[in-house]
Amino acid sequence: MSDSKEPSVQQLGLLEEEQLRGLGFRQTRGYKSLAGCLGHGALVLQLLSFTLLAGLLIQVSKFPSSISQEQSKQDAIYQNLTQLKAAVGELSEKSKLQEIYQELTQLKAAVGELPEKSKQQEIYQELTQLKAAVGELPEKSKQQEIYQELTQLKAAVGELPEKSKQQEIYQELTRLKAAVGELPEKSQQQEIYQELTQLKAAVGELPEKSKQQEIYQELTRLKAAVGELPEKSKQQEIYQELTQLKAAVERLCRPCPWEWTFFQGNCYFMSNSQRDWHDSVTACQEVGAQLVVIKSAEEQNFLQLQSSRSNRFAWMGLSDLNQEGTWQWVDGSPLSPSFKQYWNRGEPNNVGEEDCAEFSGNGWNDDKCNLAKFWICKKSAASCSRDEEQFLSPAPATPNPPPA
């Protein structure tokens, strides 16, 4: 390797020598030494390059530690910035802070003017409660609604009568309460009223107009007396008179029992409970009557009106149970062709084995016999003599109405 390089060095030396000669330099011993040194210049340059590279590597090897230190320093700065940003984020805008500061200043001045410590404590507690209450206030629309209601209430209070008028009303209420306290108990008042009502109805059915008029006048006077309600002893006296009058009326001849309605010589009972058609027939038979059989247009109009007023569907004694399409009454009589006009439009239609007739709205309807409905019983009214003795004699025994 050294042998191959020596010719190149020699050639470089010869070339340099020729160039120097061309420039007027003379060849001397020193001159030859300089040429030799220059022949070794490439090697020196290589050594310098290696030296610089080694130094550079050493410096680069030191960079990671400095970079790591710089990074940790940057992290610390970043953390400080983050904390500062969070603290700044909690602050309100400057104007808001100024407003709060001013309010605090005013509050401090006001507190300085407060009375003794106990009073300050009381005010502080009230402020705390007020603050809590304000925090619980609803949204603005709800507040507006409450405000309007308060305004209306204030206006209503403003319309109240003056204090003296209120006092007068209060005294009047007190006197009324005392008067009510002197009345007999409610059950007895109710009993008196019911007996008056029943007596009035019974008197309305009595024969002989002159006798009815006398009793009716007596009842009117008694009713007026009860309406005035004098002291308790007087009320007791009236109650005893009513009891005696009721006993006298019970001995009178009445064409129909209590709770029955008289019409054209017959008595009718309108039930207050419901049964199927067959049980309704039985209920009427048990009181000496029958499920109503209609004999005239007047009777039909009377019964239809009673049913419509009470808004009830009520059984009548009509069915086609024996033969489909052939309607007959419970007394065995067939339905008169002239009565077919009382059927509601489209009836009877026998939808689902509807074999029994009822009062429905303004006419008749056929329905299933096993359905529970109200019912109407009918029987003849009792006859009464116009003779005074007969008039005051006990009436013939009459069955009680069927259980309603």
From Swiss-Prot:
Binding residues for Ca(2+): E347, N349, V351, E354, N365, D366
Record text on subunit structure and interactions: Homotetramer. Interacts with C1QBP; the interaction is indicative for a C1q:C1QBP:CD209 signaling complex. Interacts with ICAM2 and ICAM3 by binding to mannose-like carbohydrates. Interacts (via C-type lectin domain) with CEACAM1 (via Lewis X moieties); this interaction is regulated by the glycosylation pattern of CEACAM1 on cell types and regulates contact between dendritic cells and neutrophils.
* Segments carrying motif Endocytosis signal: 14-15, 16-18, 31-34
Q: Where does it sit, as one GO cellular component term?
A: membrane
UniProt free text on domains: The tandem repeat domain, also called neck domain, mediates oligomerization.
Q: Which named protein is this?
A: CD209 antigen
The protein's job, in short, is:
Pathogen-recognition receptor expressed on the surface of immature dendritic cells (DCs) and involved in initiation of primary immune response. Thought to mediate the endocytosis of pathogens which are subsequently degraded in lysosomal compartments. The receptor returns to the cell membrane surface and the pathogen-derived antigens are presented to resting T-cells via MHC class II proteins to initiate the adaptive immune response. Probably recognizes in a calcium-dependent manner high mannose N-linked oligosaccharides in a variety of pathogen antigens.
Q: Which InterPro entries match?
A: C-type_lectin-like, C-type_lectin-like/link_sf, C-type_lectin/snaclec_domain, C-type_lectin_CS, CD209-like_CTLD, CTDL_fold
Q: Which Gene3D superfamilies match?
A: Mannose-Binding Protein A, subunit A
Task: Name which cysteines form disulfide bonds.
Answer: C256-C267, C284-C377, C356-C369
Per UniProt, subcellular location reads as:
Membrane
What Pfam families has UniProt attached to this entry? Lectin_C
* Example of a GO MF term: D-mannose binding
**What's the chief localization of this chain?**
membrane
- Residue ranges of the region described as 7 X approximate tandem repeats: 96-257
Per UniProt, what is the membrane topology?
A: Single-pass type II membrane protein
Q: Which domain of life is it from?
A: Eukaryota
Q: Which residues are glycosylated?
A: N80
**Cytoplasmic compartment residues:** 1-37
What UniProt keywords are attached to this protein's entry?
Adaptive immunity, Calcium, Cell adhesion, Disulfide bond, Endocytosis, Glycoprotein, Immunity, Innate immunity, Lectin, Mannose-binding, Membrane, Metal-binding, Receptor, Repeat, Signal-anchor, Transmembrane, Transmembrane helix
Report each sequence repeat as a residue range.
96-118, 119-141, 142-164, 165-187, 188-210, 211-233, 234-257
SUPFAM superfamilies in alphabetical order: C-type lectin-like
